[in-house]
A protein has these predicted regions:
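C-terminal motif of bacterial Sec signal peptides marking the signal peptidase cleavage site
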Residues: 33-36
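Short, low-complexity, disordered segments immediately C-terminal to signal peptides
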Residues: 38-62
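N-terminal capping segment at the start of a domain
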Residues: 58-103, 157, 307-318, 342
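Acidic/histidine-rich catalytic neighborhood of metal-dependent amide-processing enzymes
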Residues: 163-266, 274, 279-282, 286-287
Length: 358
């Protein structure tokens, strides 16, 4: 995911910080009008304003959606344990021994579930890299698919450091495993759910290059498009950086608006709205290839990790910066959002219009 900082506020992208100078007069205007940043985050442009946390959960939808299916809740303590077990393998950059161990670990936690491996060789700036997406499939009772995703590898360009990506990759992979625990053995009332553990999200160089990142998501999105499955995908929901103890999920301009509305409705219903949408920005992440392929997408992401984003892509991204409560909030809100997607009916609003980077 790309790292960008606008002025004094952080917007996440992958590996580079850019600064936009803001005049003193402009800052004065912001202070007088009450506009600006929340938790040191900025909107993606000067014309955008932070979304109030008490706002209606349906800003583009006509009315609130009724959820379908029983309410599910993750075992957040188990999700934290999974996180610790993943980082214990060490830095898991592509072509390393630990990433092979993590793949085996993920598949081992999915015993009894239909699992497919989507393996390929990526032509990266560092050479040819074998990669594998791991997709767990849980059949539903309705014709359609909801895909949940997260990346599991760490940065190749940090391979000579002890960077373990506790929040950036490990926690979200652990969260998906905890969600899988809740789905295993159940007859789902709504759409089928596919859980995709994606490889190769991070750029292979410190400076973010879209054509040298998002490898797993680009490959899987194309595969779904080529075999026609993309037409059945009702939503692709990405989780990224959601274990941060100071949890603050942003509204992403590159996500599908009605899905963002459902996410906020879910958070509000569960009493967690104070952790959502204090700021608005654009995020370039694993959801983008699926959006380009015409699928509705949602990026559930906390873009500000540490003061001024100081923990992101550093050796400070360790388990002690995370919390069980943040994992619980993120996991339960995603599960509630799934119930709301099921409640949208067979013909939810189409994905466009939404901003998708070219």
């Amino acid at each position: 995911m790309k790292d960008v900082v606008f002025g004094i506020c952080a917007v996440r992208s992958a590996g580079v910080i850019l600064c936009l100078r803001i005049s003193a007069a402009f800052i004065l205007v912001l202070s007088l009008t009450g506009a600006g940043c929340s938790h040191d985050k900025a909107d993606s442009s000067a014309s955008e304003t932070a979304a109030p946390q008490s706002a209606s959960p349906a800003t583009s939808s006509a009315k609130a959606v009724e959820p379908v299916g029983p309410a599910l809740h993750i075992d957040a303590a188990r999700a934290m344990q999974y996180t610790k077990e993943i980082v214990a393998f060490g830095p898991r950059w592509d072509s390393s021994k630990p990433i092979e161990q993590v793949r085996s670990y993920i598949k081992g936690k999915l015993k009894g579930v239909q699992v497919e491996e989507d393996s390929f060789v990526a032509e990266t700036s560092a050479g040819k890299m074998p990669m594998t997406n791991i997709v767990a499939k849980f059949p539903g009772s309705k014709d359609g698919i909801i895909v949940l995703g997260s990346h599991y590898e760490t940065n190749y360009w940090l391979r000579n450091t002890p960077f373990i990506g506790a929040n950036d990759g490990a926690a979200t992979s652990a969260l998906l495993l905890a969600i899988a625990d809740q789905l295993r053995g159940k007859k789902l009332e709504g759409y089928s759910i596919w859980i995709a553990f994606l490889d190769g999200e991070e750029s292979f160089t410190r400076q973010w290059h879209t054509n040298d990142a998002l490898w797993g998501s680009r490959h899987l999105a194309k595969k779904l498009q080529d075999d026609g499955a993309s037409k059945k995908v009702k939503a692709f929901v990405l989780a990224d950086m959601i274990g941060d103890a100071d949890l603050d999920i942003c509204r992403d301009e590159n996500s599908t608006p009605w899905l963002e509305d459902l996410l906020l409705q879910a958070a509000t219903h569960l009493g967690y709205q104070s952790h959502f949408f204090a700021s608005t920005t654009e995020v370039e992440d694993d959801h983008i290839p699926f959006a380009r392929a015409g699928m509705p997408v949602l990026d559930v992401i906390d873009i500000d990790y540490g003061y001024n984003n100081s923990f992101h892509h550093t050796v400070q991204d360790t388990v002690d910066k995370l919390s069980v409560e943040s994992l619980k909030i993120s996991g339960d809100v995603i599960l509630e959002t799934i119930r709301l997607i099921n409640g949208m009916g067979d013909n939810p609003p189409p994905a466009p219009p939404q901003r998708v980077p070219s």
